[in-house]
Amino acid sequence: MAHPSEVAQLGLLAKSVNNESAEFTGLSDALEKLGPIVRNSSLDHNYRKELSEDRAIWKEICDCLNGAHLDRVEEKEPRHLRMRAVRGMILLGRNLSVENQRLPQELALHSRVVELLAQVQCQYDEMEIALHKAAYELLYNLTRASATFDQQSLGNVCRALRYPLGAHGSRDLALPVSLYFLNMVRDDEFLFAFLKHPDADKIVYQFMLQGVIKNHTELFDVIDNKTHDLENLSSLGAIQMSIWSCLVTHASFSPYLERLESHNWEAFDTILRFAQLVVTSSEKWDKEQLTAITVWAFRIFESTASSVEEYTRRGIDDEAEASRLHQKLLVVLDILSVFSKYESIRKFIMFYNGVEVLINTLRYLQNHCMRINFTKAKSNMAATFKAYNSNYERVEDEGKIKSIINIETSSIKSTNFPECKSLIIEILGFLTYKNREVQDKCRELHGLELVLSNCVIDDNDPFIKERSIMCIRFLLEDNAENQSFVAQLEAKKAVNDDVLAEAGYEVKVGADGKIGLTKNPRAAVEDKMDLNLT
Protein backbone atom coordinates (compact mmCIF):
# COMPACT_ATOMS: atom_id res chain seq x y z
CA MET A 1 0.00 0.00 0.00
CA ALA A 2 1.42 3.37 -1.07
CA HIS A 3 1.66 6.25 1.37
CA PRO A 4 2.14 9.36 -0.80
CA SER A 5 1.72 11.79 2.08
CA GLU A 6 4.41 10.14 4.21
CA VAL A 7 6.69 9.74 1.18
CA ALA A 8 6.36 13.43 0.38
CA GLN A 9 7.07 14.48 3.95
CA LEU A 10 10.11 12.20 4.16
CA GLY A 11 11.31 13.51 0.81
CA LEU A 12 11.09 17.07 2.07
CA LEU A 13 13.08 16.16 5.17
CA ALA A 14 15.72 14.38 3.08
CA LYS A 15 16.17 17.46 0.89
CA SER A 16 16.37 19.67 3.95
CA VAL A 17 19.04 17.47 5.56
CA ASN A 18 21.02 17.23 2.34
CA ASN A 19 20.96 20.97 1.66
CA GLU A 20 24.47 22.40 1.86
CA SER A 21 23.27 25.58 3.55
CA ALA A 22 23.38 25.40 7.33
CA GLU A 23 20.83 28.22 7.41
CA PHE A 24 18.11 26.20 5.66
CA THR A 25 14.93 27.14 7.53
CA GLY A 26 12.72 24.30 6.32
CA LEU A 27 14.47 21.68 8.46
CA SER A 28 12.57 22.53 11.64
CA ASP A 29 9.22 22.38 9.82
CA ALA A 30 10.09 19.05 8.22
CA LEU A 31 11.12 17.67 11.60
CA GLU A 32 7.74 18.56 13.10
CA LYS A 33 6.00 16.55 10.37
CA LEU A 34 8.34 13.60 10.85
CA GLY A 35 7.52 13.28 14.57
CA PRO A 36 3.98 11.83 14.19
CA ILE A 37 5.16 9.35 11.55
CA VAL A 38 7.88 8.01 13.86
CA ARG A 39 5.54 7.84 16.86
CA ASN A 40 2.76 6.07 14.97
CA SER A 41 5.22 3.60 13.47
CA SER A 42 6.22 2.70 17.01
CA LEU A 43 2.73 2.41 18.51
CA ASP A 44 0.52 1.18 15.63
CA HIS A 45 1.44 -2.29 14.38
CA ASN A 46 -0.70 -2.15 11.23
CA TYR A 47 0.62 1.28 10.28
CA ARG A 48 4.19 0.11 10.89
CA LYS A 49 3.69 -2.99 8.76
CA GLU A 50 2.16 -1.00 5.90
CA LEU A 51 4.99 1.52 5.85
CA SER A 52 7.60 -1.24 6.04
CA GLU A 53 6.29 -2.73 2.79
CA ASP A 54 6.46 0.55 0.89
CA ARG A 55 9.69 0.65 -1.10
CA ALA A 56 9.37 4.41 -1.61
CA ILE A 57 9.53 4.96 2.16
CA TRP A 58 12.77 3.00 2.40
CA LYS A 59 14.21 4.86 -0.57
CA GLU A 60 13.61 8.23 1.10
CA ILE A 61 15.34 6.97 4.27
CA CYS A 62 18.34 5.86 2.19
CA ASP A 63 18.45 9.15 0.27
CA CYS A 64 18.43 11.11 3.52
CA LEU A 65 21.36 9.14 4.94
CA ASN A 66 23.29 9.28 1.67
CA GLY A 67 23.42 13.06 1.59
CA ALA A 68 23.50 13.87 5.29
CA HIS A 69 27.16 15.04 5.18
CA LEU A 70 27.73 14.62 8.91
CA ASP A 71 31.45 15.02 8.27
CA ARG A 72 31.05 18.76 7.71
CA VAL A 73 32.08 21.22 10.41
CA GLU A 74 29.10 23.26 11.57
CA GLU A 75 28.05 25.56 14.33
CA LYS A 76 26.47 23.89 17.32
CA GLU A 77 22.83 24.74 16.57
CA PRO A 78 22.65 23.69 12.89
CA ARG A 79 24.71 20.57 13.64
CA HIS A 80 22.30 19.61 16.42
CA LEU A 81 19.30 20.17 14.15
CA ARG A 82 20.77 18.17 11.28
CA MET A 83 21.67 15.27 13.60
CA ARG A 84 18.23 15.35 15.15
CA ALA A 85 16.67 15.03 11.69
CA VAL A 86 18.97 12.16 10.70
CA ARG A 87 18.24 10.43 13.99
CA GLY A 88 14.50 10.76 13.29
CA MET A 89 14.93 9.01 9.95
CA ILE A 90 17.02 6.29 11.59
CA LEU A 91 14.38 5.79 14.30
CA LEU A 92 11.76 5.36 11.60
CA GLY A 93 13.97 2.82 9.85
CA ARG A 94 14.52 1.04 13.15
CA ASN A 95 10.77 0.74 13.74
CA LEU A 96 10.00 -0.44 10.21
CA SER A 97 12.87 -2.95 10.13
CA VAL A 98 11.16 -4.91 12.88
CA GLU A 99 8.62 -5.94 10.22
CA ASN A 100 10.70 -6.00 7.07
CA GLN A 101 14.40 -6.65 6.50
CA ARG A 102 14.15 -7.61 2.83
CA LEU A 103 13.57 -4.16 1.32
CA PRO A 104 16.30 -2.36 3.31
CA GLN A 105 18.71 -5.17 2.43
CA GLU A 106 17.92 -4.76 -1.26
CA LEU A 107 18.66 -1.04 -0.92
CA ALA A 108 21.94 -1.75 0.96
CA LEU A 109 20.77 0.26 3.97
CA HIS A 110 23.26 -1.51 6.25
CA SER A 111 26.21 -0.17 4.26
CA ARG A 112 24.64 3.29 4.10
CA VAL A 113 24.19 3.47 7.87
CA VAL A 114 27.76 2.45 8.73
CA GLU A 115 29.09 4.84 6.07
CA LEU A 116 27.07 7.62 7.67
CA LEU A 117 28.45 6.82 11.14
CA ALA A 118 31.98 6.76 9.75
CA GLN A 119 31.51 10.37 8.58
CA VAL A 120 30.65 11.78 11.99
CA GLN A 121 33.11 14.32 13.39
CA CYS A 122 32.94 12.84 16.88
CA GLN A 123 32.16 15.27 19.69
CA TYR A 124 30.24 12.85 21.92
CA ASP A 125 27.50 15.31 22.76
CA GLU A 126 24.07 14.09 23.84
CA MET A 127 22.44 14.20 20.38
CA GLU A 128 25.39 12.52 18.68
CA ILE A 129 25.32 9.63 21.18
CA ALA A 130 21.54 9.35 20.79
CA LEU A 131 21.96 9.16 17.00
CA HIS A 132 24.48 6.34 17.36
CA LYS A 133 22.24 4.45 19.78
CA ALA A 134 19.35 4.58 17.29
CA ALA A 135 21.71 3.57 14.47
CA TYR A 136 22.97 0.51 16.37
CA GLU A 137 19.38 -0.53 17.06
CA LEU A 138 18.58 -0.21 13.36
CA LEU A 139 21.71 -2.16 12.42
CA TYR A 140 20.74 -4.90 14.85
CA ASN A 141 17.32 -5.24 13.22
CA LEU A 142 18.81 -5.22 9.72
CA THR A 143 21.22 -8.06 10.56
CA ARG A 144 18.89 -10.30 12.56
CA ALA A 145 18.18 -12.69 9.69
CA SER A 146 21.50 -12.24 7.90
CA ALA A 147 24.53 -10.01 8.33
CA THR A 148 24.74 -9.48 4.54
CA PHE A 149 28.41 -8.58 4.97
CA ASP A 150 30.02 -6.44 2.30
CA GLN A 151 33.82 -6.70 2.34
CA GLN A 152 34.16 -3.10 1.17
CA SER A 153 32.23 -1.84 4.20
CA LEU A 154 34.52 -3.52 6.77
CA GLY A 155 36.39 -0.31 7.57
CA ASN A 156 33.15 1.59 8.14
CA VAL A 157 31.73 -1.22 10.30
CA CYS A 158 34.87 -1.16 12.45
CA ARG A 159 34.74 2.62 12.80
CA ALA A 160 31.10 2.35 13.86
CA LEU A 161 31.95 -0.35 16.40
CA ARG A 162 34.83 1.57 17.93
CA TYR A 163 32.85 4.81 18.36
CA PRO A 164 31.72 3.98 21.94
CA LEU A 165 35.37 3.99 23.07
CA GLY A 166 35.13 7.77 23.26
CA ALA A 167 31.79 7.74 25.07
CA HIS A 168 33.41 6.90 28.42
CA GLY A 169 31.81 3.46 28.76
CA SER A 170 28.25 4.66 28.09
CA ARG A 171 25.83 1.95 29.17
CA ASP A 172 23.26 3.37 26.73
CA LEU A 173 25.49 2.24 23.87
CA ALA A 174 26.75 -1.03 25.40
CA LEU A 175 23.60 -3.07 24.79
CA PRO A 176 22.72 -2.02 21.21
CA VAL A 177 26.35 -2.26 20.05
CA SER A 178 26.70 -5.70 21.64
CA LEU A 179 23.51 -6.93 19.97
CA TYR A 180 24.66 -5.64 16.57
CA PHE A 181 28.15 -7.09 17.01
CA LEU A 182 26.66 -10.47 17.99
CA ASN A 183 24.75 -10.61 14.71
CA MET A 184 27.89 -9.71 12.79
CA VAL A 185 30.23 -12.26 14.43
CA ARG A 186 27.77 -15.03 13.61
CA ASP A 187 28.81 -14.50 9.99
CA ASP A 188 31.98 -16.50 9.22
CA GLU A 189 33.03 -14.23 6.37
CA PHE A 190 32.81 -11.12 8.52
CA LEU A 191 34.68 -12.67 11.44
CA PHE A 192 37.44 -13.94 9.17
CA ALA A 193 38.03 -10.41 7.85
CA PHE A 194 37.37 -8.62 11.14
CA LEU A 195 39.98 -10.48 13.19
CA LYS A 196 42.63 -9.38 10.68
CA HIS A 197 41.58 -5.72 10.78
CA PRO A 198 43.83 -3.25 12.68
CA ASP A 199 40.84 -2.09 14.75
CA ALA A 200 40.03 -5.59 16.03
CA ASP A 201 42.09 -5.10 19.21
CA LYS A 202 40.37 -1.81 20.03
CA ILE A 203 36.92 -3.33 19.56
CA VAL A 204 37.49 -6.74 21.15
CA TYR A 205 39.82 -5.76 23.98
CA GLN A 206 39.41 -2.05 24.73
CA PHE A 207 35.68 -1.77 24.11
CA MET A 208 34.09 -5.21 24.54
CA LEU A 209 36.31 -6.54 27.34
CA GLN A 210 37.51 -3.46 29.19
CA GLY A 211 34.56 -1.21 28.43
CA VAL A 212 31.45 -3.39 28.34
CA ILE A 213 32.29 -6.62 30.16
CA LYS A 214 34.38 -5.10 32.94
CA ASN A 215 32.14 -2.09 33.59
CA HIS A 216 28.66 -3.40 32.85
CA THR A 217 28.61 -7.16 33.50
CA GLU A 218 29.46 -9.58 36.29
CA LEU A 219 31.84 -11.67 34.18
CA PHE A 220 35.10 -10.14 35.41
CA ASP A 221 34.08 -11.14 38.94
CA VAL A 222 34.35 -14.75 37.80
CA ILE A 223 37.79 -14.19 36.26
CA ASP A 224 38.96 -12.52 39.47
CA ASN A 225 37.77 -15.56 41.47
CA LYS A 226 34.85 -13.76 43.05
CA THR A 227 31.63 -15.63 43.61
CA HIS A 228 29.04 -15.37 40.87
CA ASP A 229 26.49 -17.70 39.33
CA LEU A 230 27.04 -18.06 35.59
CA GLU A 231 23.59 -19.58 35.30
CA ASN A 232 21.96 -16.25 36.17
CA LEU A 233 23.72 -13.70 34.00
CA SER A 234 22.34 -10.30 33.13
CA SER A 235 21.09 -9.82 29.55
CA LEU A 236 24.27 -7.97 28.62
CA GLY A 237 26.43 -10.65 30.24
CA ALA A 238 24.63 -13.40 28.32
CA ILE A 239 24.99 -11.47 25.04
CA GLN A 240 28.72 -11.05 25.60
CA MET A 241 29.11 -14.76 26.35
CA SER A 242 27.39 -15.48 23.02
CA ILE A 243 29.71 -13.07 21.22
CA TRP A 244 32.76 -14.72 22.70
CA SER A 245 31.43 -18.18 21.92
CA CYS A 246 31.54 -17.15 18.26
CA LEU A 247 35.02 -15.67 18.59
CA VAL A 248 36.71 -18.60 20.35
CA THR A 249 35.27 -21.19 17.94
CA HIS A 250 36.30 -19.42 14.74
CA ALA A 251 39.29 -20.60 12.72
CA SER A 252 40.75 -17.07 12.69
CA PHE A 253 40.92 -16.83 16.48
CA SER A 254 44.18 -18.81 16.67
CA PRO A 255 46.22 -16.55 14.33
CA TYR A 256 44.58 -13.53 15.97
CA LEU A 257 45.90 -14.63 19.38
CA GLU A 258 49.36 -15.24 17.94
CA ARG A 259 49.51 -11.73 16.48
CA LEU A 260 48.13 -10.20 19.65
CA GLU A 261 50.69 -11.89 21.92
CA SER A 262 53.52 -10.56 19.79
CA HIS A 263 52.64 -6.90 20.38
CA ASN A 264 50.29 -6.59 23.37
CA TRP A 265 50.83 -9.05 26.23
CA GLU A 266 48.29 -7.44 28.55
CA ALA A 267 45.51 -7.69 25.97
CA PHE A 268 46.54 -11.25 25.05
CA ASP A 269 46.58 -12.35 28.69
CA THR A 270 43.17 -10.82 29.47
CA ILE A 271 41.57 -12.23 26.33
CA LEU A 272 43.08 -15.66 26.96
CA ARG A 273 41.76 -15.76 30.53
CA PHE A 274 38.32 -14.64 29.41
CA ALA A 275 38.35 -17.21 26.61
CA GLN A 276 39.13 -19.84 29.27
CA LEU A 277 36.00 -18.79 31.19
CA VAL A 278 33.84 -18.97 28.05
CA VAL A 279 35.24 -22.31 26.93
CA THR A 280 35.09 -24.14 30.27
CA SER A 281 31.70 -22.82 31.40
CA SER A 282 29.71 -24.68 28.75
CA GLU A 283 29.32 -28.30 27.69
CA LYS A 284 27.21 -27.48 24.63
CA TRP A 285 30.03 -27.35 22.10
CA ASP A 286 29.59 -29.49 19.00
CA LYS A 287 32.43 -31.55 17.54
CA GLU A 288 33.50 -28.82 15.10
CA GLN A 289 33.55 -26.18 17.83
CA LEU A 290 35.50 -28.43 20.19
CA THR A 291 38.15 -28.93 17.52
CA ALA A 292 38.36 -25.21 16.70
CA ILE A 293 38.94 -24.36 20.37
CA THR A 294 41.46 -27.16 20.83
CA VAL A 295 43.46 -25.95 17.82
CA TRP A 296 44.38 -22.62 19.42
CA ALA A 297 44.64 -24.03 22.95
CA PHE A 298 47.00 -26.81 21.82
CA ARG A 299 49.13 -24.44 19.74
CA ILE A 300 49.62 -22.19 22.73
CA PHE A 301 50.40 -25.24 24.87
CA GLU A 302 53.04 -26.47 22.41
CA SER A 303 54.79 -23.11 22.13
CA THR A 304 54.60 -22.51 25.88
CA ALA A 305 55.89 -25.99 26.64
CA SER A 306 58.91 -25.28 24.45
CA SER A 307 59.49 -21.99 26.30
CA VAL A 308 59.14 -23.75 29.66
CA GLU A 309 61.78 -26.27 28.59
CA GLU A 310 64.16 -23.45 27.69
CA TYR A 311 63.37 -21.60 30.92
CA THR A 312 63.97 -24.61 33.18
CA ARG A 313 67.19 -25.53 31.37
CA ARG A 314 68.65 -22.10 32.16
CA GLY A 315 68.17 -22.73 35.86
CA ILE A 316 67.78 -19.03 36.63
CA ASP A 317 64.55 -17.78 38.18
CA ASP A 318 62.95 -14.82 36.43
CA GLU A 319 59.63 -13.94 38.07
CA ALA A 320 58.36 -11.82 35.17
CA GLU A 321 59.07 -14.49 32.56
CA ALA A 322 57.85 -17.30 34.80
CA SER A 323 54.62 -15.43 35.50
CA ARG A 324 53.79 -15.20 31.81
CA LEU A 325 54.72 -18.81 31.10
CA HIS A 326 52.81 -20.05 34.13
CA GLN A 327 49.69 -18.05 33.28
CA LYS A 328 49.59 -19.34 29.70
CA LEU A 329 50.33 -22.91 30.72
CA LEU A 330 47.67 -22.88 33.42
CA VAL A 331 44.95 -21.60 31.08
CA VAL A 332 45.55 -24.00 28.21
CA LEU A 333 46.10 -27.02 30.47
CA ASP A 334 42.81 -26.26 32.18
CA ILE A 335 41.04 -26.14 28.80
CA LEU A 336 42.69 -29.36 27.61
CA SER A 337 41.85 -31.15 30.87
CA VAL A 338 38.18 -30.18 30.51
CA PHE A 339 38.07 -31.19 26.83
CA SER A 340 40.02 -34.44 27.25
CA LYS A 341 36.83 -36.22 28.28
CA TYR A 342 35.74 -36.05 24.63
CA GLU A 343 36.98 -38.84 22.38
CA SER A 344 37.53 -36.54 19.39
CA ILE A 345 39.82 -34.31 21.45
CA ARG A 346 41.78 -37.26 22.86
CA LYS A 347 42.38 -38.39 19.28
CA PHE A 348 43.42 -34.84 18.32
CA ILE A 349 45.97 -34.65 21.15
CA MET A 350 47.38 -38.08 20.31
CA PHE A 351 47.57 -37.34 16.57
CA TYR A 352 49.62 -34.19 17.19
CA ASN A 353 52.07 -35.96 19.54
CA GLY A 354 50.46 -34.45 22.60
CA VAL A 355 51.42 -37.38 24.83
CA GLU A 356 55.10 -36.73 24.15
CA VAL A 357 54.73 -32.99 24.80
CA LEU A 358 52.80 -33.60 28.02
CA ILE A 359 55.33 -36.09 29.40
CA ASN A 360 58.33 -33.97 28.43
CA THR A 361 56.78 -30.89 30.05
CA LEU A 362 55.98 -32.92 33.16
CA ARG A 363 59.61 -34.02 33.30
CA TYR A 364 60.97 -30.47 33.03
CA LEU A 365 58.60 -29.28 35.74
CA GLN A 366 59.43 -32.28 37.92
CA ASN A 367 63.12 -31.47 37.79
CA HIS A 368 62.59 -27.74 38.27
CA CYS A 369 59.78 -27.41 40.80
CA MET A 370 59.94 -27.97 44.54
CA ARG A 371 57.33 -29.93 46.43
CA ILE A 372 55.75 -27.79 49.15
CA ASN A 373 53.96 -28.88 52.30
CA PHE A 374 52.28 -26.19 54.38
CA THR A 375 51.13 -26.70 57.93
CA LYS A 376 48.07 -24.84 59.14
CA ALA A 377 48.83 -21.73 61.09
CA LYS A 378 47.85 -21.61 64.73
CA SER A 379 46.36 -18.47 66.20
CA ASN A 380 48.75 -15.49 66.04
CA MET A 381 51.31 -17.61 64.22
CA ALA A 382 52.34 -17.73 60.59
CA ALA A 383 51.93 -20.94 58.60
CA THR A 384 55.05 -23.08 58.35
CA PHE A 385 56.16 -25.15 55.40
CA LYS A 386 58.67 -27.67 54.16
CA ALA A 387 60.20 -27.68 50.69
CA TYR A 388 61.68 -30.68 48.86
CA ASN A 389 63.62 -30.96 45.60
CA SER A 390 62.93 -33.46 42.81
CA ASN A 391 64.84 -36.13 44.75
CA TYR A 392 62.59 -35.46 47.76
CA GLU A 393 65.48 -34.07 49.74
CA ARG A 394 64.65 -31.30 52.19
CA VAL A 395 65.60 -27.85 50.88
CA GLU A 396 67.02 -25.55 53.55
CA ASP A 397 68.62 -22.89 51.34
CA GLU A 398 66.79 -19.66 52.23
CA GLY A 399 67.56 -18.06 48.87
CA LYS A 400 66.03 -20.95 46.94
CA ILE A 401 62.99 -21.00 49.18
CA LYS A 402 62.41 -17.26 48.77
CA SER A 403 62.64 -17.68 45.00
CA ILE A 404 59.51 -19.84 44.99
CA ILE A 405 57.57 -18.78 48.11
CA ASN A 406 56.39 -15.40 49.29
CA ILE A 407 57.23 -15.76 52.97
CA GLU A 408 54.98 -12.88 54.05
CA THR A 409 51.83 -14.24 52.39
CA SER A 410 52.74 -17.95 52.48
CA SER A 411 51.87 -18.14 48.79
CA ILE A 412 53.70 -19.99 46.05
CA LYS A 413 55.22 -17.93 43.25
CA SER A 414 54.87 -18.54 39.53
CA THR A 415 58.52 -19.60 39.44
CA ASN A 416 57.39 -22.96 40.87
CA PHE A 417 54.56 -23.32 38.30
CA PRO A 418 51.83 -24.24 40.80
CA GLU A 419 49.01 -26.57 39.63
CA CYS A 420 50.61 -27.34 36.26
CA LYS A 421 51.89 -30.85 37.03
CA SER A 422 48.55 -31.80 38.52
CA LEU A 423 46.69 -30.73 35.36
CA ILE A 424 49.15 -32.56 33.09
CA ILE A 425 48.65 -35.78 35.03
CA GLU A 426 44.88 -35.33 34.90
CA ILE A 427 45.07 -35.02 31.10
CA LEU A 428 47.33 -38.09 30.88
CA GLY A 429 44.76 -39.97 32.95
CA PHE A 430 42.03 -39.18 30.43
CA LEU A 431 44.29 -40.14 27.51
CA THR A 432 45.37 -43.39 29.15
CA TYR A 433 41.89 -44.63 30.07
CA LYS A 434 41.36 -47.94 28.22
CA ASN A 435 43.92 -46.98 25.58
CA ARG A 436 46.73 -49.49 25.12
CA GLU A 437 48.70 -47.25 22.75
CA VAL A 438 48.94 -44.44 25.29
CA GLN A 439 49.65 -46.88 28.13
CA ASP A 440 52.65 -48.25 26.25
CA LYS A 441 53.84 -44.84 25.12
CA CYS A 442 53.84 -43.59 28.71
CA ARG A 443 56.07 -46.50 29.71
CA GLU A 444 58.40 -46.05 26.74
CA LEU A 445 58.76 -42.32 27.43
CA HIS A 446 59.36 -42.99 31.15
CA GLY A 447 56.18 -41.20 32.01
CA LEU A 448 55.10 -44.04 34.26
CA GLU A 449 57.89 -43.28 36.72
CA LEU A 450 57.05 -39.58 36.62
CA VAL A 451 53.43 -40.22 37.52
CA LEU A 452 54.44 -42.65 40.26
CA SER A 453 56.76 -40.08 41.79
CA ASN A 454 53.86 -37.65 42.15
CA CYS A 455 51.64 -39.89 44.25
CA VAL A 456 52.32 -37.60 47.19
CA ILE A 457 50.61 -34.66 48.83
CA ASP A 458 52.00 -31.45 47.40
CA ASP A 459 50.51 -28.04 48.13
CA ASN A 460 52.15 -26.76 44.96
CA ASP A 461 49.84 -29.06 43.01
CA PRO A 462 46.48 -29.64 44.70
CA PHE A 463 44.94 -33.08 44.06
CA ILE A 464 48.12 -34.34 42.39
CA LYS A 465 48.24 -37.44 44.60
CA GLU A 466 44.66 -38.44 43.80
CA ARG A 467 45.09 -37.75 40.08
CA SER A 468 48.39 -39.63 39.95
CA ILE A 469 46.93 -42.69 41.66
CA MET A 470 44.00 -42.70 39.24
CA CYS A 471 46.38 -42.30 36.30
CA ILE A 472 48.50 -45.22 37.59
CA ARG A 473 45.37 -47.32 37.81
CA PHE A 474 44.60 -46.63 34.13
CA LEU A 475 48.23 -47.22 33.12
CA LEU A 476 48.24 -50.66 34.73
CA GLU A 477 44.80 -51.83 33.69
CA ASP A 478 45.04 -54.91 31.41
CA ASN A 479 48.66 -54.08 30.58
CA ALA A 480 51.06 -56.84 31.61
CA GLU A 481 54.16 -54.92 30.51
CA ASN A 482 53.31 -51.91 32.64
CA GLN A 483 52.42 -54.11 35.59
CA SER A 484 55.73 -55.95 35.31
CA PHE A 485 57.61 -52.67 35.03
CA VAL A 486 56.00 -51.29 38.20
CA ALA A 487 56.52 -54.58 40.04
CA GLN A 488 60.24 -54.39 39.31
CA LEU A 489 60.31 -50.82 40.60
CA GLU A 490 58.52 -51.94 43.75
CA ALA A 491 61.09 -54.67 44.29
CA LYS A 492 63.74 -51.95 44.28
CA LYS A 493 61.64 -50.03 46.82
CA ALA A 494 61.10 -47.29 44.24
CA VAL A 495 57.34 -47.53 44.65
CA ASN A 496 55.31 -47.11 47.81
CA ASP A 497 53.12 -50.17 48.50
CA ASP A 498 50.37 -47.86 49.73
CA VAL A 499 50.25 -46.19 46.32
CA LEU A 500 49.72 -49.51 44.59
CA ALA A 501 47.08 -50.46 47.11
CA GLU A 502 45.21 -47.23 46.49
CA ALA A 503 45.43 -47.91 42.77
CA GLY A 504 43.86 -51.32 43.38
CA TYR A 505 46.94 -53.53 43.00
CA GLU A 506 49.29 -55.53 45.19
CA VAL A 507 52.68 -57.17 44.65
CA LYS A 508 52.80 -60.97 44.41
CA VAL A 509 55.74 -63.35 44.09
CA GLY A 510 54.90 -66.24 41.76
CA ALA A 511 55.86 -69.89 42.14
CA ASP A 512 58.73 -69.26 39.76
CA GLY A 513 60.02 -66.51 42.02
CA LYS A 514 59.07 -63.72 39.63
CA ILE A 515 57.56 -60.55 41.00
CA GLY A 516 54.29 -59.33 39.53
CA LEU A 517 51.20 -57.26 40.24
CA THR A 518 47.71 -58.54 40.77
CA LYS A 519 44.47 -56.71 41.28
CA ASN A 520 43.45 -56.48 44.88
CA PRO A 521 39.74 -57.38 44.97
CA ARG A 522 39.41 -55.96 48.47
CA ALA A 523 40.81 -52.55 47.52
CA ALA A 524 38.15 -49.89 47.31
CA VAL A 525 39.32 -47.52 44.65
CA GLU A 526 37.29 -44.34 44.46
CA ASP A 527 37.11 -42.60 41.09
CA LYS A 528 38.21 -39.02 41.55
CA MET A 529 38.04 -38.16 37.86
CA ASP A 530 35.07 -37.50 35.62
CA LEU A 531 35.04 -40.76 33.68
CA ASN A 532 31.88 -40.06 31.74
CA LEU A 533 34.05 -40.04 28.63
CA THR A 534 32.37 -39.26 25.33
Curated annotation (Swiss-Prot):
Pfam families referenced in this protein's UniProt entry, alphabetically: Atx10homo_assoc
Keywords from the named record: Cell cycle, Cell division, Cytoplasm
Where does the UniProt entry say this protein principally localizes? cytoplasm
Location(s) in or outside the cell: Cytoplasm
Superkingdom of this entry's organism? Answer: Eukaryota
Gene Ontology terms: biological process:
cell division
Q: Does Protease count among this protein's keywords?
A: no
Q: What does this protein do?
A: May play a role in the regulation of cytokinesis.
How is this protein named in the record? Ataxin-10 homolog
Q: Which organism is it from?
A: Eremothecium gossypii (strain ATCC 10895 / CBS 109.51 / FGSC 9923 / NRRL Y-1056)
